[in-house]
A protein has these predicted regions:
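Polytopic transmembrane helical bundles with strong interfacial aromatic enrichment
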Residues: 1-130
Length: 130
Protein backbone atom coordinates (compact mmCIF):
# COMPACT_ATOMS: atom_id res chain seq x y z
CA UNK A 1 0.00 0.00 0.00
CA UNK A 2 2.94 2.37 0.54
CA UNK A 3 3.31 2.68 -3.24
CA UNK A 4 -0.26 3.95 -3.50
CA UNK A 5 0.25 6.30 -0.56
CA UNK A 6 3.15 7.87 -2.47
CA UNK A 7 1.09 8.06 -5.67
CA UNK A 8 -1.74 9.74 -3.77
CA UNK A 9 0.57 12.32 -2.24
CA UNK A 10 2.10 13.00 -5.65
CA UNK A 11 -1.37 13.48 -7.16
CA UNK A 12 -2.25 15.96 -4.39
CA UNK A 13 1.02 17.91 -4.65
CA UNK A 14 0.76 18.18 -8.43
CA UNK A 15 -2.87 19.31 -8.22
CA UNK A 16 -1.91 22.11 -5.80
CA UNK A 17 0.95 23.18 -8.10
CA UNK A 18 -1.30 23.10 -11.17
CA UNK A 19 -4.01 24.96 -9.25
CA UNK A 20 -1.57 27.76 -8.50
CA UNK A 21 -0.32 27.66 -12.10
CA UNK A 22 -3.87 27.96 -13.39
CA UNK A 23 -4.91 30.69 -10.95
CA UNK A 24 -1.86 32.89 -11.49
CA UNK A 25 -0.42 32.17 -14.93
CA UNK A 26 -3.20 30.74 -17.04
CA UNK A 27 -6.13 32.91 -15.94
CA UNK A 28 -5.26 35.61 -18.48
CA UNK A 29 -4.18 33.19 -21.21
CA UNK A 30 -7.09 30.77 -21.35
CA UNK A 31 -10.72 31.32 -22.19
CA UNK A 32 -13.25 30.93 -19.41
CA UNK A 33 -14.21 27.51 -20.80
CA UNK A 34 -10.60 26.34 -21.04
CA UNK A 35 -9.83 27.52 -17.52
CA UNK A 36 -12.96 25.81 -16.23
CA UNK A 37 -11.85 22.55 -17.89
CA UNK A 38 -8.37 22.93 -16.40
CA UNK A 39 -9.95 23.37 -12.94
CA UNK A 40 -12.06 20.25 -13.50
CA UNK A 41 -8.89 18.25 -14.11
CA UNK A 42 -7.39 19.64 -10.90
CA UNK A 43 -10.51 18.86 -8.87
CA UNK A 44 -10.71 15.26 -10.08
CA UNK A 45 -6.99 14.75 -9.50
CA UNK A 46 -7.19 16.09 -5.94
CA UNK A 47 -10.35 14.14 -5.08
CA UNK A 48 -8.89 10.90 -6.38
CA UNK A 49 -5.51 11.56 -4.77
CA UNK A 50 -7.27 11.94 -1.42
CA UNK A 51 -9.44 8.89 -2.10
CA UNK A 52 -6.38 6.75 -2.87
CA UNK A 53 -4.71 7.99 0.32
CA UNK A 54 -7.75 7.26 2.51
CA UNK A 55 -8.30 3.85 0.94
CA UNK A 56 -4.63 2.92 1.25
CA UNK A 57 -4.61 3.85 4.92
CA UNK A 58 -7.75 1.78 5.51
CA UNK A 59 -6.89 -1.24 3.39
CA UNK A 60 -8.00 -3.64 6.14
CA UNK A 61 -11.61 -2.70 5.40
CA UNK A 62 -11.48 -4.12 1.90
CA UNK A 63 -10.78 -7.44 0.25
CA UNK A 64 -7.39 -8.23 -1.22
CA UNK A 65 -8.66 -6.81 -4.52
CA UNK A 66 -8.26 -3.23 -3.27
CA UNK A 67 -4.96 -2.88 -5.16
CA UNK A 68 -6.80 -3.44 -8.43
CA UNK A 69 -9.23 -0.66 -7.62
CA UNK A 70 -6.40 1.68 -6.59
CA UNK A 71 -4.48 0.88 -9.77
CA UNK A 72 -7.56 1.59 -11.89
CA UNK A 73 -8.16 4.82 -9.97
CA UNK A 74 -4.54 5.90 -10.53
CA UNK A 75 -4.59 5.13 -14.26
CA UNK A 76 -8.00 6.76 -14.68
CA UNK A 77 -6.85 9.90 -12.89
CA UNK A 78 -3.77 10.27 -15.08
CA UNK A 79 -5.71 9.72 -18.31
CA UNK A 80 -8.66 11.90 -17.32
CA UNK A 81 -6.93 14.84 -15.64
CA UNK A 82 -3.78 15.08 -17.71
CA UNK A 83 -5.63 14.85 -21.02
CA UNK A 84 -7.81 17.74 -19.80
CA UNK A 85 -4.74 19.78 -18.82
CA UNK A 86 -3.14 19.39 -22.22
CA UNK A 87 -6.39 19.94 -24.12
CA UNK A 88 -7.03 23.12 -22.09
CA UNK A 89 -3.66 24.64 -23.01
CA UNK A 90 -3.71 23.37 -26.61
CA UNK A 91 -3.96 26.89 -28.08
CA UNK A 92 -0.86 27.97 -26.15
CA UNK A 93 1.32 25.20 -27.56
CA UNK A 94 3.11 25.18 -30.90
CA UNK A 95 1.70 21.71 -31.62
CA UNK A 96 -1.77 20.28 -31.27
CA UNK A 97 -2.75 18.06 -28.36
CA UNK A 98 -6.22 17.33 -29.72
CA UNK A 99 -5.18 13.70 -30.29
CA UNK A 100 -5.50 13.32 -26.49
CA UNK A 101 -9.24 14.01 -26.68
CA UNK A 102 -10.29 10.33 -26.60
CA UNK A 103 -8.27 9.76 -23.42
CA UNK A 104 -10.59 11.93 -21.33
CA UNK A 105 -13.68 9.70 -21.58
CA UNK A 106 -11.51 6.58 -21.38
CA UNK A 107 -9.98 7.89 -18.15
CA UNK A 108 -13.42 8.82 -16.84
CA UNK A 109 -14.73 5.35 -17.61
CA UNK A 110 -11.77 3.79 -15.81
CA UNK A 111 -12.48 6.01 -12.79
CA UNK A 112 -16.12 4.92 -12.72
CA UNK A 113 -15.01 1.30 -13.04
CA UNK A 114 -12.57 1.71 -10.15
CA UNK A 115 -15.35 2.95 -7.86
CA UNK A 116 -17.73 0.16 -8.86
CA UNK A 117 -14.97 -2.42 -8.39
CA UNK A 118 -14.26 -0.92 -4.97
CA UNK A 119 -17.94 -1.09 -4.02
CA UNK A 120 -18.06 -4.76 -4.95
CA UNK A 121 -15.02 -5.53 -2.82
CA UNK A 122 -15.90 -3.98 0.52
CA UNK A 123 -15.73 -6.68 3.16
CA UNK A 124 -19.28 -7.80 3.81
CA UNK A 125 -18.59 -9.92 6.87
CA UNK A 126 -17.65 -7.10 9.24
CA UNK A 127 -20.26 -4.37 9.66
CA UNK A 128 -17.97 -2.27 11.86
CA UNK A 129 -16.04 -1.33 8.72
CA UNK A 130 -18.98 -0.02 6.76
Amino acid sequence: MSKFIKVSILFCVVSVILGAFGAHLLKDLLSETELSSFKTGIRYQMFHGLAILILSLNSNKFTSKLKTSLLLMSIGTVLFSFSIYFLSIDDLLSFSMKFLGPLTPIGGTILITSWIYLLLNVKNNDTTHI
